[in-house]
From Swiss-Prot:
This is Myosin light chain kinase 3. The lineage of its organism: Eukaryota, Metazoa, Chordata, Craniata, Vertebrata. The active site is at residue 603. It is found in: Cytoplasm. It is an enzyme of class 2 (transferase). GO terms for biological process: cardiac myofibril assembly; cellular response to interleukin-1; positive regulation of membrane permeability; positive regulation of sarcomere organization; positive regulation of tight junction disassembly; sarcomere organization; sarcomerogenesis; signal transduction. SUPFAM superfamilies: Protein kinase-like (PK-like) (SSF56112). InterPro entries: Kinase-like_dom_sf, Prot_kinase_dom, Protein_kinase_ATP_BS, Ser/Thr_kinase_AS. Residues 233-258, 279-315, 333-443 are annotated as: Disordered. It catalyses: L-seryl-[myosin light chain] + ATP = O-phospho-L-seryl-[myosin light chain] + ADP + H(+); L-threonyl-[myosin light chain] + ATP = O-phospho-L-threonyl-[myosin light chain] + ADP + H(+). It comes from Rattus norvegicus. GO terms for molecular function: ATP binding; calcium/calmodulin-dependent protein kinase activity; myosin light chain kinase activity. ATP binds at residues 488-496, 511.
Amino acid sequence: MSGVSEEDPEGLGPQGLPALGGACLVTVDKKLNVLTEKVDRLLHFQEDVTEKLQCVCQGMDHLEQGLHRLEASQELGLAGPGSTSPAAAQAAWPEVLELVRAVRQEGAQHGARLEALFKMVVAVDRAITLVGSTIQNSKVDDFILQGTVPWRKGSLADGPEENKEQAEVAGVKPKHVLNTGSVQAATSRALWEESQKQDTPVGTVEGLPLIIDTSLKGADLTQAGASLRQGVEALDPGQEPPPTEAESRLPALASEDTGTTLELSVAIDRISEVLTSLRMSQSAGEGTSSSKPDCSEPGPQPLGPLTTDSDIHSDEGLPRISVRMREMTTPEELFETQGGSPIGSAEAPGPGTVLEDQIPKGARPFPPLPKRSCNNGGASAEEATGPGAEPIRGPSLVTRDWRDEPVGTTDLQQGRDPGAVSPEPGKDHAAQGPGRTEAGRRVSSAAEAAIVVLDDSAAPPAPFEHRVVSIKDTLISTSYTVSQHEVLGGGRFGQVHRCTERSTGLALAAKIIKVKNIKDREDVKNEINIMNQLSHVNLIQLYDAFESKNSFTLIMEYVDGGELFDRITDEKYHLTELDVVLFTRQICEGVHYLHQHYILHLDLKPENILCVSQTGHQIKIIDFGLARRYKPREKLKVNFGTPEFLAPEVVNYEFVSFPTDMWSVGVITYMLLSGLSPFLGETDAETMNFIVNCSWDFDADTFKGLSEEAKDFVSRLLVKEKSCRMSATQCLKHEWLNHLIAKASGSNVRLRSQLLLQKYMAQRKWKKHFHVVTAVNRLRKFPTCP
């Protein structure tokens, strides 16, 4: 024994080597722990330095503002009356005198110009007065006031002769028919006066027969017309109203619509004859009827310039007359209604039938009419009937282009035949109009479908500034209104409801977390501490926090786009590879910010990625309940619900680090590109086995047509060895996530992943329901308490 001790004085025998190795391991472990503590101290020191630098920056800002204020006050002091010497002030007096003289000269020049302008205005006023007094009693004024089209072919003296012939043929008129000249003159004057008060006259005078409500008696209308005529005659010739916008456009329209006005005059005469024959036949065959107006009096009754059955509204004693007219060809096509009751024959209107009425109060409105574009000037006129129809805004005189409406057709038809054509081939513009419009819409929709605009801008920041939130013990109801019935989401923690801040009305989200023990409370506090350090547009922001006996409530930023996979599985959403690039890039930017602050998310999955809007490509990462600060050699057991997004080191309970999150990013990217889960098996055990062995491949059908850059991106993330995976910084520099403009110019590939994603989500929902049913069946087997 002594010999052995002499040869081996240090005691390094076969049994001494393990002891020495154990001591070395203990020493290395102690050094690593010391190193970890130093790293933590450095991190805390870095945070303190950052806070102090922010305070210094704020102090510098305040100092700069104070310096600016001081300079401004000094400048004001130097500019004061006592700042300059008397000698300098005396030297500046001549300049001031020169400036005053120049101002006086300019004032005199402006006065002379104003005087000349005043003289010009007086001369123009006199000229207008002369023109008004000249035209006041002319035939042009009579035609304008009587509502007759002044630019029709023929002599201007034809109008009064036609009126005389109509008056001779009129015979016995009903009580409600008024004198043409007085009522129409008063109506035109009333319409002009209303147009001066407001720009929205109810009626439009189109040079067509006026339609007046039968509920008003003839004596009342005659009295109103007489009062209006007295008001018009009382006007001074110098106060003659200027011509309206439509009247000023009459000469221009006269040269364009000469052909159409001939058709209009023929249609008016034809309508007069039709009404005369119809009323004579009604009075001879049917006699008087209680359900019809009094039209059984003997004698022919032409249409005349005035017909009834329209609404007259009074505004400050001035009647408003709404004018409407439709063309008709034969007596069989006439269908006149009053308050919803037919006059004459009660046949249902068909193609070519005309409804000539103005819907009174309480009557059933007609469907809105299609827009018709006028050829003169490109203006468009839209007619609508019913209580909800708005009055036509514009001048009191509106001309209508009758070339767009063929004879025998009308817009107010029930049961209109879409295949009906105009009897005259030269006037089928209205029949071709809808077809052209539909063709134009198809072309525009095809052009819009060919041009797809993708929004690659950054996600919008939170509607509030980043803040360090401290937990409050007060009731949440004192500051926020939580909508318990409006659930935004849920999970292992609890539910997320929509809420509103009482003081500002800001829309927020309230995450209610149930806690049962001290460990749960510590986890929630850890989540709050981590979110206090996050300030990035792709990460959800914390606004407030409340603690109660059995729960925590985190008030966070609200986004209404829904989960990422809920949106891309929508049938109306078409996913392309460029869309996946935009989504993946923003996910990598958020993860890169987390890793820069030594934070691991450890629960990246599609359910924890929200879209900011329903149409854009902006996303935000949520749920930091499992997030941890990075510490070397830490074993972390994750309580997860869906295993196919976990990294092999998490399944094996090994050390986790930054590449753990990048594995989840690779799985999410694979699913976005293909619609398949790379490791999903029939059971959870099979799924974990695939993850541990890293057994996956690119499906030949789903990845057909995708770029090699996309496959390379996924291949460099789904690697079993942690050190071989790309980091978030390397992902952002990858070729696939860059050069978006070039990719957008040549991106015409549409993915087939949408249907596969729908099938995948349906399968997951089915599995969840199956587990719920299984759990319920197991609970039923437990014996019940007596």
